Amino acid sequence: MSGHSKWHNIQGRKNAQDAKRGKIFQKISHDLYVAAKAGGADPSANASLRLVMDKAKAANMPKDNVQRALDKATGAGDVKFEEATYEGYAPGGIAVLVETSTDNINRTVSNVRNSFNHHGGSLGTSGSVSFQFDRRGHFVIDRQSHPDITEDQVMEDAIEAGAEDVQTSDDAFEIFSQPADFAAVEGALTDKGYDLAESEITMIPQNPVEVPEADQEKFEKLIDELEDNDDVLAVYTTAD
């Protein structure tokens, strides 16, 4: 269905964060991890991974960083990693999910807890906020990259590819799928010539809320500190 899209606002915040080189590499590392975890570390047999590796090359990401992300996903190398997801609340009552992959679970939980405590948040228990999110495949087509494309055409192609929802705005088309259909939808869209500005499995908040102005600074500092943690793969919030 068509609907209001907040991709432009979200993208603006992402662009500001990605001004730091490390943020760009962290995002690519996360996408490498997710793609390799889902479909293996061989890019010739994993279209999703191949696309992310192209992004890594374009960003001049060091090969060691790429290999580290793949090793985390596949369990290769001398160091073994385990996944853990932490849930809590940021200032203003904003729900936060923190996905991690770590070789030292005690270090990671301590660092995550300290980040919450230092910035006015609180680390909760498993299940305390995850019910407020839905895991979905998420694809973005920037309308500037496809100026002649119509909403009806995108809708038809997305549904044919196996997507479950399409939202439109002046800036972009957003396409959503079930996680199990992610690779098939991504492959079908790229085969049709779409340049995907975003292509990821993510957590979508069911009811986004505004961050109270009085809590904005603490909220941003908490999220920035969590994202700067080397063990953190991704941070999701219910912030609008």
Curated annotation (Swiss-Prot):
It comes from the Bacteria. GO terms for cellular component: cytosol. InterPro entries: Integrase-like_N, TACO1_YebC-like_2nd/3rd_dom, TACO1_YebC_N, Transcrip_reg_TACO1-like, Transcrip_reg_TACO1-like_dom3, YebC-like. Keywords: Cytoplasm, DNA-binding, Transcription, Transcription regulation. GO terms for biological process: regulation of DNA-templated transcription. GO terms for molecular function: DNA binding. It is found in: Cytoplasm. The keyword Transcription applies. Residues 1-21 are annotated as: Disordered. Belongs to the TACO1 family. This is Probable transcriptional regulatory protein OEOE_0768. It comes from Oenococcus oeni (strain ATCC BAA-331 / PSU-1).
